[in-house]
Amino acid sequence: MTELYPLTPPGPSRRSTLRAAGGGTLLLGLGLAGCRSAVSDSSSAPQGASAASQRGGVLNVAVNADFTPALLFAQSGQSLQHRLIYNTLTRYDDRLRPKPELAASWTYAKDGRSITLRLRDDVTFHNGRKFSADDVIFAVKNLQNPVRAAQLRSTAATVTGFEKRGDHELVLKLAHPVNNLFDLFEFMIITDSETVEDAVTGKKLIGTGPFKLKKWSPGSGLSLTRNDRYWQAGRPYLDGVELRVIAQADALISSLRSGQSQLSFDVPGKSLGAVKNDPRLAITNYDTGAGAVYLGVNTTVAPLNDRTVRQALAWAVDRDRLLDQTLGGYGLASAAPWPKSSPAFTEANRTHYTHNPGKARQLLKSAGHTKLELPLLHLALPGDTAIAESIQYDLRQVGVHVTLQPTDGATAQKKLISQGMPALWTMGHGFAQVQPSTLAVSAYPFNEAKNTSKYRSAEYTKVVQEAWTEPETDTAAANALHEKISSILLDEAFLIDLVVRGRVQVTADRVHGVTLNKFSYLNLDHAYLV
């Protein structure tokens, strides 16, 4: 057996903070190259370390879209509440090393066909029921249920057997080895099995997390209150959290500036320049690529069934302009989905497609087209609309005229899951920030078995399956498979990546200790107000 925990302490965080100081900003280059990311001057300590932790207060979080209960297990665009109400089995540090949460320790079999989890024995659900191995079994089976539309369902499905060794030790038996099991453990929220059907309608959200649901007001947001029986002693510091829906960008920014809201991840890129000049607000860039911007292509709609036409679109978009003018400079212009923190990243793949409208027109002409008219679906939110308009402008320059289709988030997510997208769409994707294999076996836009673009390829499936089951210890073989996946994605262009970016966090200067997990679940265990 191979013991995977305890591990060495985590290294420096890949997050970095940019704090406004009057009318100017001091940038110290501690971020990843190509990402707009820095720390403040030496007089400011990192968030969470600048003052003594204080108990009490309610944190108001401004979000631009409401929680969608039906997508609780699918990871929608608004998943902040997941780690507030629930816990996961493990959590990654910034080097993708798993750390304990509800699983206190674990032992992986040498053949990769089973893992033994030793669970915490001091955890209770919000309704007073004790957490046990049965809850982990339920959580895995719940994600295996196709009704839940979980993007990590394929990984959950590799668990084919369970062996309980008492209430707090569990062996998961796998159909075959996979190298992204801890991605599943970070993604999979542990819900109360007795009320799960009420959870997906928003009636009851019962977990083991630091906050309990007080009220969900559809269209207005979530009201959470402190869990006084939380298993982490003395946590959380906050008395409560309010997730307030503020759909209009100007109103959201005004809420932050006035102090009505103290935290948001939804300030549009175009507005970040104004925000960073406010000395009362700080910008933190999570630059490990949890939310890349892309142009999706339905490969069953003519002439997009022609790879040459899809490649023309990839050459047509000005990624650098999109990044600078629409996203506020936060991110990395990239033709490939990988952040620089990923083992799959290469500079050659990042720059495989650059802005070349002449080449785009030439490819379209070679395919017999000088003018195309296509629909382009996008989320009906200010930041997403600006992205769609930027893409629309670039495509028009090469003779591709698109009609924008603004769509609410819940409807767009359902279309993404059901393969119901029109010819073109633009949204954001995650899953490139964890194990590279997870992107191609889990994320709806990339899934080798069933993706939104309706692209199928025996070669793609073969390479993805090999990458998924390749032991992490064989770095050279794993990297070779990652390169094959990247080559197929770039050559086939059924999904056209534009900018790799993480979540951009705006906080009031009185907020400390805010973090996100790899799937953008908000963690406020150690957060406090001063």
Where do the PLM segments sit?
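Surface-exposed binding/hinge segments that line
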Residues: R118, L152-E194, K215
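Structural transition elements
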Residues: G328-S366, G383-A386, T473
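Ligand-site clamp/hinge motif
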Residues: R229-A274, H401
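Extracytoplasmic/peripheral linker and loop segments enriched in polar/acidic and small residues
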Residues: H401-P406, A410-A412, V441-A508
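N-terminal secretory signal peptides
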Residues: M1-S13, G23-A33
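Gly/Pro-rich hinge or "lid" segments in bacterial periplasmic/extracellular proteins
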Residues: F185-P236, G240
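Periplasmic-binding protein-like
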Residues: T300-S341, A386-I387, L489-F494
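N-terminal lobe/hinge region of extracytoplasmic solute-binding protein
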Residues: A62-K110, K141, I206-G207
